[in-house]
């Protein structure tokens, strides 16, 4: 790889404030804020609004919004799937 054209790739802590969960990974993102991780090292921390811990799809709390009865109409026409 050519020198000087690639962004810095380093360990970063991503923190989901809604779920009170944090995870350490590598990223090109950085931050002025830092946090001390469980291994005793200090890493930049990036606060995110939603992650796999708090997203409804991954937590199993997702709901199908059916405003016009389309799911019921489909099930009446073609029957329920097995």
From Swiss-Prot:
SUPFAM superfamilies: L28p-like. It comes from the Bacteria. The keyword Ribosomal protein applies. Disulfide bonds: none annotated. GO terms for cellular component: ribonucleoprotein complex; ribosome. One of its GO terms (biological process) is translation. InterPro entries: Ribosomal_bL28/bL31-like_sf, Ribosomal_bL31, Ribosomal_bL31_B, Ribosomal_bL31_sf. GO terms for molecular function: structural constituent of ribosome. Pfam families: Ribosomal_L31. Keywords: Ribonucleoprotein, Ribosomal protein. HAMAP family: Ribosomal_bL31_2. Belongs to the bacterial ribosomal protein bL31 family. Type B subfamily. Part of the 50S ribosomal subunit. This is Large ribosomal subunit protein bL31B-2. It comes from Streptomyces avermitilis (strain ATCC 31267 / DSM 46492 / JCM 5070 / NBRC 14893 / NCIMB 12804 / NRRL 8165 / MA-4680).
């Amino acid at each position: 790889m050519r020198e000087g054209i690639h962004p810095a790739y380093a360990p970063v802590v991503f923190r989901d404030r809604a779920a009170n969960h944090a995870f350490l990974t590598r990223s090109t993102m950085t931050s002025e804020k830092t946090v001390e991780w469980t291994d005793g090292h200090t890493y930049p921390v990036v606060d995110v609004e939603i992650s796999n811990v708090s997203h409804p799809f991954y937590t199993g709390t997702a709901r199908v919004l059916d405003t016009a009865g389309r799911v019921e109409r489909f099930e009446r026409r073609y029957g329920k799937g097995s």
